[in-house]
């Protein structure tokens, strides 16, 4: 296996046994690919902006004299880059410019003669851009657009499962769902009539739709029924016999032909009878005349002589009618064939309840239902019906919809057609009737072949189209308004509706969410989330159990584990590790192809629909060397059912064991030993882990950690290979390898690192270089670690030495006992950065001012502010301190003469402004790390703003100059190489000024051209540098575009250091969560025979009932890993030679049956030394999910580390020194600190604000509210008979306004008496009763 440069520094021992056929695909591709499709120009016009434009344009005027045509579009360059957008609070977007052509036709000339053509580029608003990490920056905050799982367009056949009608009869229905347009439903009622609904409105008999399509009764009957022919032959009645139709009937007369009686009267017709009739070729039998009575005629029978209708189509035949028919000479009669078994008379019955007689009456009926109250006209009715399903503007099935529709009704023409036609409607009705007759199956709505993914690109395109349609109406009107000679396309288009639609979608759609940025994993999982909620999706209340449940087709597509607990369970899912979307938006998952019983490395992606046809083996099926299956019978899946299949029948095999689960779930080692409910909590809690101060890789991982860290985009990854030229805290410079150069560039890559910035969740984002100058790197290598990454691996928590034992009740009910050492070593210390904003506005009474001159504030409170009234960087502040001084003018009050006199003498001061400074919130204390001042264009900048500006300019200049010098150096080195090969000596060049090298001449023409090219590049580089600096300077110095009425914004960034403390929530990766109950001194913690104390004590009772045994295995394996580290440390202490180390390491990496081949011999001495250095803390281990380390391997590793194979040690009590009576499981578990910190939750109130109506204290920390003393608490005091306490609770402590004011005064005076009065809420109750017209008065006790 080839290890990349960073991987060699610390090789994970892999316990996986299955070979890796397929690497995990790029994790964010679902977002990036979808958006690229939307943005990039598609010549076919199938997707994205192009499709939206083509669907709306050309726009014709109402009178047809002119039209506006679409030519092409282009996207400009963004004004600010991503970081600048975040700082300034603006949207990262590109301007959209569209080339339009206005064509004016000549009214007087024949149609289509062009009078004038004008072309122009029109600005059509801004299109937000996706960053490289799959997010959008909207108004300065990073947001994610979650993909939506919605019902695919097409036709669905379903039943109510007998729930609608009391009889329990199953009613079938069919629904045609377009991508946009009206829904068309067909449904049976309990009487077996077939009805139709349009857009879920009132139902009409379904034959109305057929009549509206111009069908007569005869044609309708002809389409839906088989016929039976009767012939009248001299007083007898002969019936045409199709033997198959007799199945299951009881003969009402002797069935005989040619003198043979086949079935006697009253006998049931069996299959044997039918075979006999078929064999003898009986095609006509004589029937009694009564047999035809009650049968339904299939067409009109007319008396030729009089012209009267004897029997109409769909009318029952009676004896009189029969007599009339034979009189009129109708010898051949055609009736409908129906029976109760599989040819129901549904359409015939429906025709009887249908009141319409012809096309017009049917159209009018439909019009009345769609537009009740409007008088129908023939034209309006026709136009409405036409536009409902047959017009491309109003109705579109989309490619997906048409594909699903055709496959459902078995049509193979009309592949491109987006609208419905007559055939479609009739075929759907036929299929529905067939299902009612017992042929065919209803669809499963939760099957992933019937639900598709709508990603960012598609949703943005839909919103964009909505905006365009709004514009279209306005354009049509303007085109019809007379004189077009002076009009240009720009005058017709108003970009506001378009940008409003797009802005609304990105800013406030239910699926545009504030990115979860706790740690790299939470970012990745948020972008891979699939939601069934949102516009056009389900709602929480309506979603039943079936939709939320795991479906067999989720296998390898959606994760069965990772979903939120609570009301959204099952509605919000996560993409499985290898899943991807196909062109139609259906989820696919990869499988290895099996050819003639041999498993190949060829991989096919199958969607849920395709998968149903194959037999698929599991990833852990045993294989022989040659790729054939080892066992005769193999566990495999077919149509979602798991079972044993002979190996010859297998078509495919899973690619990997973690194919089923999502990324978060595949980060849980030994997932296979955990109960699913706990695994769900484990997967969800990893996303809440706060990045610790020092990231530490997990000793026991699953091998996916590197993928997450690299794909999440928090690390800095080499774009091209090369040698590290220089490294400092803020930038890394790489000299690119010769073979990866683009001709004519300097060959230097510069990576600027992010330092101490705030994430959406107020955690700290900081990148630290993990390479040294002179090191070689390859493309894709990690150069710098971000938050929660360690040497390019995801590191959400810390490896803690834990013991499973009770300890004095401090770990009762999932509490956690932590050693003081953990706090001292800052293992779980986290940094949180808060942004506090102060806005100075223009008010009616004058503008607010940011100043250090604040009325009635002492000197001490201003000590941390500079002269501009803004706090300086580095100040340590606590709750209540002023950060930005601000005063607001307040309204003139009427002054008394005395005050006027005083003001006249002492001048105006303080009376006309009030203090509205920005203060530190109460429970917060920390250090100021950054201040930013934004000033409106045209407002004078204060001193602090100018200082910041100067500093930024200096930084920008320094950065760009360094960058230029690096690039210049690279270029001049190449010049030097050319000159040296052209005959100049090293000494000569060293004495010449480097800039002059470019002016030297060479004999060799080829070299001279090369030199000239380099000189040209040098000039370009310089010009580029000047241009870059000018742009930077302009951006820094120009005024900011602030919201209307805002003059200045000051943003202050406050860093808070949070150590771990009792009340903080911690968790392992197996759903084992708990709250810290006590921080115990190290000397009191249990310790082992070597005197090493444990860090954390967990309760063993938390394991058996929760069935997450994975944590025990993790602890054992962690202990073994640490044992190997200790062994290496011992060898280092003994200063053994390198060969011994190589031998030991080889032994460790070869242990157990594993797919991993590590050849220590191929590493250089330096590399081995680095590896040893990184393994001293313990051997990192990968145990992939469902393919993890076996019990035997763990024991072997424990043995190699010199530890007991049971994984249990004798521990001694730290307080007494006595040994505990039985060995205790001790080991290393990876623990996370979750973002539920006690500091953010702890809250107490003395007095504060009250609710307006009830006058009771508000609730919640944000409102500085009180604790609710509810109904049950009142019962408790009543039960104790604590009458006075209860009275106090319900009056002065709550809503007795006078009482509480008095009480406050009394306490101030040192008198602790209380006088309870009438609670305000009681008055509210009285008012409410009076509002009902009941007079209620309070009487004093006499």
Curated annotation (Swiss-Prot):
Gene3D superfamilies assigned to the protein according to its UniProt record, in alphabetical order: 2.40.50.100, 2.40.50.150, 3.90.1100.10, 6.10.140.1670, DNA-directed RNA polymerase, beta subunit, external 1 domain, DNA-directed RNA polymerase, subunit 2, domain 6, RNA polymerase alpha subunit dimerisation domain
Domain of life, source organism: Bacteria
Record carries keyword Heme: no
InterPro entries hit by this protein: DNA-dir_RNA_pol_bsu_ext_1_sf (IPR042107), DNA-dir_RNA_pol_bsu_external_1 (IPR019462), DNA-dir_RNA_pol_su2 (IPR015712), DNA-dir_RNAP_su2_dom (IPR007120), DNA-dir_RNAP_su2_hyb_sf (IPR037033), RNA_pol_bsu_bac (IPR010243), RNA_pol_bsu_CS (IPR007121), RNA_pol_bsu_protrusion (IPR007644)
The keyword Nucleotidyltransferase is annotated on this UniProt entry: yes
GO cellular component, one term: DNA-directed RNA polymerase complex
Described function: DNA-dependent RNA polymerase catalyzes the transcription of DNA into RNA using the four ribonucleoside triphosphates as substrates.
Subunit composition and interactions: The RNAP catalytic core consists of 2 alpha, 1 beta, 1 beta' and 1 omega subunit. When a sigma factor is associated with the core the holoenzyme is formed, which can initiate transcription.
Protein name: DNA-directed RNA polymerase subunit beta
Organism: Vibrio vulnificus (strain YJ016)
Highest classification ranks of the organism: Bacteria, Pseudomonadati, Pseudomonadota, Gammaproteobacteria, Vibrionales
Gene encoding the protein: rpoB
């Amino acid at each position: 296996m080839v290890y990349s440069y960073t991987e060699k520094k610390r090789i994970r021992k892999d316990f996986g046994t299955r070979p890796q056929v397929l690497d995990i695909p790029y994790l964010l591709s679902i977002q990036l690919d979808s958006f690229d499709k939307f943005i990039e120009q598609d010549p076919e016009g199938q997707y994205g902006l192009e499709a939206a434009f083509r669907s709306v344009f050309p726009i014709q005027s109402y009178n047809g004299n002119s039209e506006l045509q679409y030519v092409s579009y282009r996207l400009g360059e963004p004004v600010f880059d991503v970081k600048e957008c975040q700082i300034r609070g603006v949207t990262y977007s590109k301007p959209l410019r569209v080339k339009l052509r206005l064509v004016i036709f000549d009214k007087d000339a024949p149609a289509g003669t062009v009078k004038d053509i004008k072309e122009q580029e029109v600005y059509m608003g801004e299109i937000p851009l996706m960053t490289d990490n799959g997010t959008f920056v909207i108004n300065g905050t990073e947001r994610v657009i979650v993909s939506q799982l919605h019902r695919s367009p097409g036709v669905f056949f379903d039943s109510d499962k007998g729930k609608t009608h009391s009889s329990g009869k199953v009613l079938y229905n069919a629904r045609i769902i377009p991508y946009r347009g009206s829904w068309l439903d067909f449904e049976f009622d309990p009487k077996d009539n077939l009805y139709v609904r349009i857009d879920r409105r009132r139902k009409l008999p379904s034959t109305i739709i057929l009549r509206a399509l111009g069908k007569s009764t005869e044609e309708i009957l002809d389409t839906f029924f088989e016929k039976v022919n009767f012939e009248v032959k001299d007083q007898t009645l002969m019936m045409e016999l199709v033997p198959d139709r007799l199945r299951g009937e009881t003969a009402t007369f002797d069935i005989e032909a040619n003198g043979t009686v086949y079935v006697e009267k009253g006998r049931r017709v069996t299959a044997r009878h039918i075979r006999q009739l078929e064999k003898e070729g009986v095609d006509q039998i004589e029937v009694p005349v009564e047999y035809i009575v009650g049968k339904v005629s299939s067409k009109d029978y007319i008396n030729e002589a009089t012209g009267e209708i004897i029997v109409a189509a769909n009318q029952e035949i009676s004896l009189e009618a029969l007599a009339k028919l034979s009189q009129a000479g109708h010898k051949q009669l055609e009736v409908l064939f129906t029976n109760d078994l599989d040819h129901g008379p549904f359409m015939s019955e429906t025709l009887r309840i249908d009141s319409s007689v012809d096309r017009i009456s049917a159209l009018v009926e439909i019009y009345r239902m769609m537009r009740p109250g409007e008088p129908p006209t023939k034209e309006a009715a026709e136009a409405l019906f036409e536009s409902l399903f047959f017009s491309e503007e109003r109705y579109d099935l989309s490619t997906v919809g048409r594909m699903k529709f055709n496959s459902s009704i078995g049509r193979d023409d009309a592949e491109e057609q987006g609208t419905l036609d007559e055939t479609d409607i009739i075929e759907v009705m036929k299929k529905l009737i067939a299902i009612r007759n017992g042929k065919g199956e209803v669809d499963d709505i939760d099957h992933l072949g019937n639900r598709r993914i709508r990603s960012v690109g598609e949703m943005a395109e839909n919103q964009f189209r909505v905006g365009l349609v709004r514009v279209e109406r306005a354009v049509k009107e303007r085109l019809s308004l007379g004189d077009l000679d002076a009009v240009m396309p720009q005058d017709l288009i108003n970009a506001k509706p378009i940008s409003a639609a797009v802005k609304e979608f990105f800013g406030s759609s239910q699926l545009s969410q504030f990115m979860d940025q706790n740690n790299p994993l939470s970012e990745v999982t948020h972008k891979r989330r699939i939601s069934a909620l949102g516009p056009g999706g389900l709602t929480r209340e309506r979603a039943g159990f079936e939709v939320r449940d795991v479906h067999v087709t989720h296998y390898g597509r959606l994760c069965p584990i990772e979903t939120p607990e609570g009301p959204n369970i099952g509605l919000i899912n996560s993409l499985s590790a290898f899943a991807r979307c196909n062109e139609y938006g259906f989820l696919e998952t990869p499988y290895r192809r099996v050819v003639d019983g041999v498993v190949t490395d060829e991989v096919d992606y199958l969607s849920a629909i395709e998968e149903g046809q194959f037999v698929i083996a599991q990833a852990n099926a045993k294989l022989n060397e040659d790729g054939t299956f080892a066992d005769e019978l193999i566990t495999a899946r077919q149509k979602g059912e798991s079972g044993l299949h002979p190996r010859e029948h297998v078509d495919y095999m899973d690619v990997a064991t973690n194919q089923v689960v999502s990324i978060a779930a595949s980060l849980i080692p030994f997932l296979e030993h955990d109960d699913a409910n706990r695994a769900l909590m484990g997967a969800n809690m990893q996303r809440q882990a706060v990045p610790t101060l020092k990231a530490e890789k997990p000793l026991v991982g699953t091998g996916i950690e590197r993928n997450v860290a690299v794909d999440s985009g928090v690390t800095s990854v080499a774009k091209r290979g090369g040698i590290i030229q220089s490294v400092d805290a803020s930038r890394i410079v790489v000299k690119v390898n010769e073979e990866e150069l683009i001709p004519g560039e300097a060959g230097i890559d510069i990576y600027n690192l992010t330092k101490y910035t705030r994430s959406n969740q107020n955690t700290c984002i900081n990148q630290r270089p993990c390479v040294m100058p002179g090191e070689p790197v390859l493309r894709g290598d990690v150069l710098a670690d971000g938050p929660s990454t360690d040497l390019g691996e995801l590191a959400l928590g810390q490896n803690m030495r834990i013991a499973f034992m009770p300890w004095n009740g401090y770990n009762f009910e999932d509490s956690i006992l932590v050693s003081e050492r953990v706090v001292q070593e800052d293992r779980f210390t986290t940094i949180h950065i808060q942004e506090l904003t102060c806005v100075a506005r223009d008010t009616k009474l004058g503008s607010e001012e940011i100043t250090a001159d604040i009325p009635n504030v002492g000197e001490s409170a201003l000590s941390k502010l500079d002269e501009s009234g803004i706090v300086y960087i580095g100040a340590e502040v606590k709750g209540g301190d002023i950060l930005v001084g601000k005063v607001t003018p307040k309204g003139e009050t009427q002054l008394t003469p005395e005050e006027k006199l005083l003001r006249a003498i002492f001048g105006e001061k303080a009376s006309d402004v009030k203090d509205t400074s920005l203060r530190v919130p109460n429970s917060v204390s920390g250090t100021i790390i950054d201040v930013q001042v934004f000033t409106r264009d045209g407002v004078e900048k204060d001193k602090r703003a100018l200082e910041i500006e100067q500093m930024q300019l200096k930084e920008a200049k320094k950065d760009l100059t360094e960058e230029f010098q690096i690039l210049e150096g690279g270029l001049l080195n190449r010049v030097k190489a050319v000159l040296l090969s052209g005959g100049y000596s090293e000494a000569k060049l060293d004495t010449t000024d480097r800039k002059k090298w470019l002016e030297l001449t060479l004999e060799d023409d080829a070299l001279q051209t090369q030199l000239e090219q380099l000189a040209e590049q040098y000039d370009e580089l310089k010009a580029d540098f000047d241009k870059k600096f000018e742009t930077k300077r302009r951006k820094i110095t120009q005024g900011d575009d602030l919201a209307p009425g805002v003059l200045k914004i000051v943003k202050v960034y406050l860093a808070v250091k949070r150590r771990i403390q009792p009340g903080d929530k911690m968790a392992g990766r197996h759903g084992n969560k708990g709250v810290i109950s006590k921080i115990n001194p190290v000397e009191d913690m249990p310790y082992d025979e070597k005197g090493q104390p444990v860090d954390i004590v967990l309760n063993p009772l938390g394991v058996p009932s929760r069935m997450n045994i994975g944590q025990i295995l993790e602890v054992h394996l962690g202990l073994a890993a640490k044992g190997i580290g200790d062994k290496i440390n011992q060898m280092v202490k003994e200063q053994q030679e390198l060969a011994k180390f190589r031998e030991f390491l080889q032994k460790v990496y070869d242990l157990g049956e594993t797919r991993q081949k590590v050849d220590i011999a191929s590493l250089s001495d330096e590399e081995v030394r680095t590896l040893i250095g990184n393994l001293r803390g313990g051997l990192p281990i990968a145990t992939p999910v469902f393919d993890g380390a076996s019990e035997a391997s763990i024991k072997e590793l424990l043995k190699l580390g010199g530890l007991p194979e049971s994984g249990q040690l004798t521990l001694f009590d730290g307080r007494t020194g006595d040994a505990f009576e039985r060995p205790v499981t001790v080991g290393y578990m990876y623990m996370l600190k979750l973002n539920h910190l006690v500091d953010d939750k702890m809250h107490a109130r003395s007095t504060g604000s009250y609710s307006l109506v009830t006058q009771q204290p508000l609730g919640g920390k944000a409102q500085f509210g009180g604790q609710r003393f509810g109904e049950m608490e009142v019962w408790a005091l009543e039960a104790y008979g604590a009458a006075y306490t209860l009275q106090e609770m319900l009056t002065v402590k709550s809503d007795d306004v006078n009482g509480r004011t008095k009480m406050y005064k009394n306490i101030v005076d040192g008198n602790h008496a209380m006088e309870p009065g009438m609670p305000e809420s009681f008055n509210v109750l009285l008012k409410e009763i009076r509002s009902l017209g009941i007079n209620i008065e309070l009487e004093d006790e006499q």
